[in-house]
Amino acid sequence: MQRHVHRADLGERDPDYIRDYLPWLWLVASAWFRADVRGLENIPERGPALLVGNHSGGNMIPDTVILTMAFSTYFGAERPFYQLAHNLVLALPALAPLRRFGTVAATPENAAGALDAGAVLLVYPGGDHEVSRPVWQRNLIDFDGRRGFVRQALDAGVPLVPVVSIGGQETALFLSRGAGLARALRLDRTLRLKTLPISIAAPWGLNVGDFLGHVPLPAKITIQILPAIDLHERFGPDPDVDEVYEHVVALMQRTLDELAAERRLPVLG
C-alpha cells in the first residue's frame, strides 16, 4: 500500500528561524561547496513563480539548500519560498529543519497551494530518478519525461523560471539508480520510491539507498537561474505541453553544457 502524503502546512516556514540561521548556513555552504549562484535577478521581483530545476546530490540535496539560502539572502526571509521534496527526505532527522525553510512534500496539491498563496515554488521534475543518476550522466538533464511542472505553471498562470545546477552529482560517487532493486523490494508501492541508489560515499563506503545520508564531498556547485518564461507570451494562448517541455529541457541542457565547459576537474570545479 502506498504511503499517504499529507497536504503541507505552509505555515511551518519560519522567517525568523531563517533569519537566525541564514548567515552561518550560507557561510558553511559557500565555504564547503564554493557556492556560486547566478541570475537571481531573473526571478520576478514579486508574485508567484515556478522555478524548475535539475536535481543532484542524493538525499543530502545540496543544490536545494544552496538555492534556498541564496534566495532568502537576495529577496529577504519574509518573501515566501517553498521547495518540493520527496516525503522520505523530509523524514530524515538530519533534514527535518528544512520544513522551517519551506520544504514541503512533492504533491500537486502542495504545489498548487504554495502558488495560490503567492509564493515562489521550486520543483525538481526529475525527482529520485534524476538525483540518483550515475556519475557518468552527471551533466545530463533527465526529467524522465515528467511534464507535470508545465501543467502546474499553466494551471496557476505563473511564469516558469528554469534553474540549472552543476556539481551536486560530484558530492559522492553515484554508481546506479538501483531501479530494479527498488522494484524487487516493492519500494515503489510502499514508499513511492522508484530507485534505490547505490553509491560510494563517506563515511559508509558502499552506500545503498542513502537513507542515513552521507558526508558530501566539497564539490564546487554552480547554479544558473535563467530568465523567466511567460508561457502564453512565448507559446500562444493555448500552449502545447509537449512543446513547452521540450523547449525547457533543451534550454536547460544547453546551459548545463556551458557550465560543464567551465569546469576543469570533477569536484574541484
Please identify what each model-predicted range represents.
Residues 1-18, 113-269:
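Non-catalytic C-terminal accessory region of glycerolipid acyltransferases
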